[in-house]
């Protein structure tokens, strides 16, 4: 079901939406609105107060200095603000494509690390600062020099873990940056083997080693004077994040990710009339998203899911049952939950078991007992899709073909992961008459038929301004950077029919993993909490 178009003039608060059940008015008035109800249309513009002007464009808790200066300067020169439609004067009358990147620069301290950091210390930096990636200075003379840098993220940690577990063949790695440029391939392989053996013994391994093995897109930089249009084109081609530098390009002043950019576009959507058409159109009308989502079956092992994300160069997989019904999602960030020896046994448990474990941990840490599965259908409006992406801080939403009963009850009874776990654990209770069809799995969102990503949406916005984008460009570039393996070896790695052999290997590999992390006892507590 598509959403009604939002009104640009005098936007109404979702909290005051007319109640469709007058007799239950008191009950519904006290009910806590769902995320989707609150964010199905762009948020209203803030009140025209000086305090609101100060906080106008920042995606963080602090705004850029240039934003504050521009706002105060125009107010001091008598620019109208009370009762005016020009709420944010520094960009009054500007289209989103003309916005300078200085308006999106966070004034928070930029966190970065040096290439000499150990993998474990780099991982702790991600966890302690709640980051998904961190810039890495590769300068040998000045560790604060970020003019040339790479990034460390959870995909690197995943590669590191898979290497320790003997799940990656050397032929699958990019070895061009290892050792000296004149070293033979055999010599480079020898260096890799020696380094991995150090990791297995619990010795520290510098992140410079692992980030060179796991190819990424070049770390693209833009100056604060560049416009949002240029960044939209780059991120719309699948690059996950870019650096923003000062005007002289001598210092990185911030990192702009796809996730932060979509949040900015959503929070400021009412200022940009050119977005109206797209936000009110459905995914089907806009023809965005992929019809070939990458997935893992619920009964496959977690280690297989981690390998598949490595091999496919993706950061998330849909989790489905054998009827292709969507159950949930597994992310590359989830690798942090098995980076402790006490949880290593989960690597050889089913993906469904791991999802259940993640839910229990979130319940303990966040005090929540239910988590919705964030999916959409082809008739969902782009506004609804972006609202869910922003609310969940996700990079993608799964497109499903909803069965009639689930779709009719989706508003009053949103599908939760807990409900799907119950259905998966007790398939006979889902439907005694037709348990082998998606329609029989009442309680599941529906059959997985596609995926829509931040890349798709940002690419759509860039295309609307006349440029061409390829959502698969960056991913294909990452895949070309590594040596491909044969299809047969991949298929054998993710097959499901050899459970007994896998159990034997699991015990041996799990012991290797345990030795690697228990040796670094002083860091165990920091890792175990995640």
Swiss-Prot record:
This is Protein SDS23. Residues 213-274, 289-347 form the CBS domain. One of its GO terms (cellular component) is cytoplasm. It is found in: Cytoplasm; Nucleus. CDD domains: CBS_pair_SF. GO terms for molecular function: protein serine/threonine phosphatase inhibitor activity. Keywords: CBS domain, Cytoplasm, Nucleus, Repeat. PANTHER family: AMP-ACTIVATED PROTEIN KINASE, GAMMA REGULATORY SUBUNIT, CBS DOMAIN-CONTAINING PROTEIN. It comes from Scheffersomyces stipitis (strain ATCC 58785 / CBS 6054 / NBRC 10063 / NRRL Y-11545).
């Amino acid at each position: 079901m598509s959403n009604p178009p939002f009104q640009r003039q005098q936007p109404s608060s979702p909290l005051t939406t007319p109640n469709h059940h007058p007799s239950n008015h008191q009950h519904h008035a006290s009910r806590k609105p769902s995320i989707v109800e609150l964010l199905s249309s762009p948020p209203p513009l803030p009140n025209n107060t000086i305090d609101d002007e100060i906080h106008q464009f920042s995606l963080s808790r602090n705004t850029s200095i240039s934003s504050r200066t521009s706002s105060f300067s125009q107010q001091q020169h008598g620019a109208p603000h009370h009762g005016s439609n020009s709420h944010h004067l520094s960009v009054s009358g500007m289209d989103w494509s003309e916005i300078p990147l200085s308006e999106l620069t966070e004034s928070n301290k930029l966190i970065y690390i040096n290439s000499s950091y150990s993998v474990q210390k780099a991982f702790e930096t991600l966890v302690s600062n709640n980051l998904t990636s961190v810039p890495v200075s590769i300068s040998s003379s000045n560790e604060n020099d970020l003019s040339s840098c790479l990034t460390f993220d959870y995909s690197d940690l995943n590669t590191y873990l898979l290497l320790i577990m003997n799940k990656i063949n050397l032929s699958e790695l990019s070895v061009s940056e290892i050792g000296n440029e004149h070293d033979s391939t055999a010599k480079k392989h020898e260096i890799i083997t020696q380094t991995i053996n150090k990791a297995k013994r619990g010795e520290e391994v510098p992140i410079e080693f692992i980030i060179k093995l796991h190819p990424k897109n070049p770390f693209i930089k833009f100056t604060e004077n560049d416009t949002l249009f240029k960044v939209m084109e780059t991120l719309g081609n699948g690059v996950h994040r870019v650096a923003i530098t000062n005007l002289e390009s001598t210092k990185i002043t911030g990192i702009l990710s796809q996730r932060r950019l979509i949040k900015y576009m959503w929070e400021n959507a009412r200022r940009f009339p050119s977005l109206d058409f797209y936000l009110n159109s459905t995914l089907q009308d806009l023809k965005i998203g992929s019809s070939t989502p990458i997935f893992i079956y619920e009964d496959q092992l977690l280690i297989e899911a981690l390998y598949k994300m490595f091999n496919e160069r993706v950061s998330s997989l849909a989790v489905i049952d054998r009827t292709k019904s969507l159950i949930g999602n597994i992310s590359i960030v989830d690798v942090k939950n098995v980076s402790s020896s006490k949880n290593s046994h989960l690597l050889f448990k089913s993906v469904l078991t791991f999802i259940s474990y993640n839910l229990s941990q979130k319940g303990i840490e966040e005090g929540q007992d239910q988590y919705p599965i964030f999916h959409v259908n082809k008739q969902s409006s782009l506004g609804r899709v972006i609202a869910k992406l922003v609310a969940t801080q996700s990079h993608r939403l799964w497109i499903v073909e909803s069965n009639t009963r689930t779709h009719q009850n989706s508003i009053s009874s949103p599908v939760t992961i807990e409900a799907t776990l119950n259905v998966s654990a007790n398939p006979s209770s889902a439907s005694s008459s037709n348990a082998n069809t998606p329609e029989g799995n009442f309680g599941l969102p529906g059959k997985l038929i596609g995926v829509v990503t931040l890349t798709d949406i940002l690419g759509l916005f860039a295309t609307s301004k006349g440029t061409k984008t390829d959502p698969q460009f960056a991913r294909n570039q990452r895949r070309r950077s590594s040596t491909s393996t044969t299809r047969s070896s991949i298929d054998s790695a993710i097959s499901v029919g050899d459970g007994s052999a896998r159990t034997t290997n699991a015990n041996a590999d799990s012991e290797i993993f345990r030795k690697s992390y228990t040796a670094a006892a002083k860091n165990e507590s920091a890792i175990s909490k995640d």
